[in-house]
């Protein structure tokens, strides 16, 4: 949701990648903004830095400034709240509430993914649109059917659904997302040797009894690779990831320290899957072989 919000503010000309946003979460001009717990920021942060660090405060403010109608229109333009039309039974629309029903609390939280619900295929299609220069295509399962003698009896033809943002905005947002997988970002573990990766972490609280749980999460990472000339999108989600956050609990349970955040749970799995798919598709590397084999310990890296 933060990436779609970034697309919206850039496409509307409200901000650029280097525009600086005040990070005071008790700003009197905003209503109950979600804090960046456990993180110490400078007084301001650029939109680019907000993507890299996954700032709840900045995106809460950006969404609030866009307003509910405009924010919801971009979410809808990216295919949220709609059936994608993929050739699978039982597809769900997700939940994209009517913006007329959004109060200040809801529309300041929608940019961080609260109050809305999306399916994996919707999110994959939205990120593919960013990789496709802002063009949203209908996802599909079967690319072609070939007979034993080599005759092609069916070939899928790409179907354009819409153009939610301009190619230049899509490129700018993709470039910002590359920082997520680099040093200082929330998902260094998603880096694929030899390839640039543009991605975003997700750490979503699971609703429980009318509110959001502080113990149950969906941890995810979605990436577009190679970022310089996108070929694939991979989305990995862990539902209810087991986590043990302290050394004391770890020793008592006899298990290693785990973390429920997308940058630690899902990012490494993304890296493993993307590495195999890129080789299978024979996609040429776009970066020197610079990605290290070893990644930082949990307490040395920022994850959200």
Where are these regions (language model features)?
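Beta-lactam-recognizing serine transpeptidase/beta-lactamase-like catalytic domain environment
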Residues: 4-247, 262, 266, 295-297, ...
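Short amphipathic alpha-helical signal-transduction/dimerization elements
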Residues: 131, 181, 271-278, 282
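Flexible, small/polar- and glycine-enriched "cap/hinge" segments at structural transition points
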Residues: 265-272, 276, 287
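Gram-negative outer-membrane assembly/targeting C-terminal domains
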Residues: 278-304
């Amino acid at each position: 949701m933060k990436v779609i919000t970034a697309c919206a503010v850039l496409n509307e000309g409200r901000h650029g990648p280097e525009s600086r946003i005040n990070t005071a979460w008790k700003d009197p001009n905003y209503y109950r903004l979600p804090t960046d717990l456990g993180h110490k920021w400078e007084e301001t942060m650029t939109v680019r830095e907000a993507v890299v660090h996954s700032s709840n405060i900045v995106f809460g403010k950006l969404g609030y400034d866009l307003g509910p109608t405009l924010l919801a229109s971009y979410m809808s333009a990216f295919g949220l709240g709609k059936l994608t039309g993929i050739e699978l039974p039982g597809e769900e629309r997700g939940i994209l509430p009517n913006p007329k029903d959004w109060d200040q609390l809801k529309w300041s939280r929608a940019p961080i993914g609260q109050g809305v619900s999306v399916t994996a295929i919707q999110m994959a299609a939205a990120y593919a649109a960013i990789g496709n220069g802002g063009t949203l295509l209908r996802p599909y399962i079967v690319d072609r059917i070939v007979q034993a003698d080599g005759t092609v009896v069916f070939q899928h033809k790409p179907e354009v659904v819409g153009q939610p943002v301009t190619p230049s905005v899509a490129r700018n947002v993709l470039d910002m997302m590359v920082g997520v997988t680099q040093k200082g970002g929330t998902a260094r573990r998603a880096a694929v040797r030899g390839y640039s990766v543009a991605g975003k972490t997700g750490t979503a609280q699971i609703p429980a009894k009318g509110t959001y749980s502080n113990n149950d999460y969906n941890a995810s990472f979605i990436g577009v690779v190679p970022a310089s000339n996108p070929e694939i999108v991979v989305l990995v989600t862990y539902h209810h990831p087991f986590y043990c956050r302290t050394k004391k609990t770890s020793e008592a349970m006899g298990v290693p320290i785990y973390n429920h955040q997308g940058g630690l749970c899902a990012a490494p799995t993304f890296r493993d899957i993307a590495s195999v798919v890129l080789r299978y598709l024979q996609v040429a590397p776009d970066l020197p072989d610079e990605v290290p084999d070893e990644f930082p310990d949990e307490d040395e890296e920022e994850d959200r």
